[in-house]
Amino acid sequence: MFKLTSLNLNGIRSATSKGVESWMAATRPDCICVQEVKAQAADMANRFERLADLHGHFHFAQKKGYSGVGIYTRHEPSDVVIGYGSAEFDAEGRYVELRFDTPERKLSIISAYFPSGSSGEERQQAKFRFLAEFHPHLMRLKAERDFILCGDINIAHQQIDLKNWRSNQKNSGFLPEERAWMTKLLHTTDEGGGIIDVYRQLQPTATDTAYTWWSNRGQAYANNVGWRLD
């Protein structure tokens, strides 16, 4: 059985100081997709390039201490793709793809970090531009090969994907346009789609146990007032 994990690190230095390497060793994934590495190549050398006997491949942001994604793998990929060809967003370190190809099958594993629009209108518009680029990229990839997309999507698709959906309908992460993008991705249409939300396929009614992000405000984590953004 192939074991795949996805995790937002919120900084690799912080995560390792809190025991993520021991957790990786204990859970023994074949691949672990990570987001928000918040480091540069020089920071990783001789320390974070390899964790728990898994070798890492990364896409770093040009801006220091910002964004960055990676995939730690137990298996050598046949190819590594850094970025998805975006003039705007490849500078932000948001996409790494490992290809595991055999004569019988072409398979990609992707770690992606979607932009957040919560800081203001400028970043929300950037998020919309990212979504407009990323859907056709995934559809082109789907026409060529199988893939598994992991990451911090920064979108709660359905009402059951966040605690307080009524009060968040005008907030980034649950905007109608963002949710419509997810629907287009997951449902087969003339524009493509047909991607499977694996978590929802396995847990179609899960609510309180589904959350992956909690606000730092108030007692959101203590009260499990969360969102499924990953």
What residue ranges belong to the model's regions?
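N-terminal, active-site-proximal structural segment of metallo-dependent hydrolase catalytic domains
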Residues: M1-R50, A61, Y66-S67
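Active-site-proximal beta-strand elements of phosphoester/diester hydrolases
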Residues: F2-N10, K106-S118, C150
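Active-site beta-strand/loop signature of hydrolases that rely on acidic residues for catalysis
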Residues: L7-N8, M24-A42, I109, L138-Q159, ...
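Short catalytic/ligand-binding loop motif for oxyanion handling, primarily in non-cytosolic enzymes
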Residues: R13, A41-D43, G65-Y66, S118-G120, ...
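Short amphipathic alpha-helices and their capping/turn segments at secondary-structure boundaries
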Residues: S22-A25, Y95-E104, E133-R145
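Structured beta-strand-rich core segments of catalytic domains in phosphoester-bond hydrolases
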Residues: K38-Q40, M44-G117
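Metal-dependent phosphoesterases centered on the DNase I-like endonuclease/exonuclease/phosphatase
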Residues: A52-H55, F130-R228
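Surface-exposed cleft-lining segments at the edges of enzyme active sites
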Residues: G85-S86, F114-L131, R166-S172
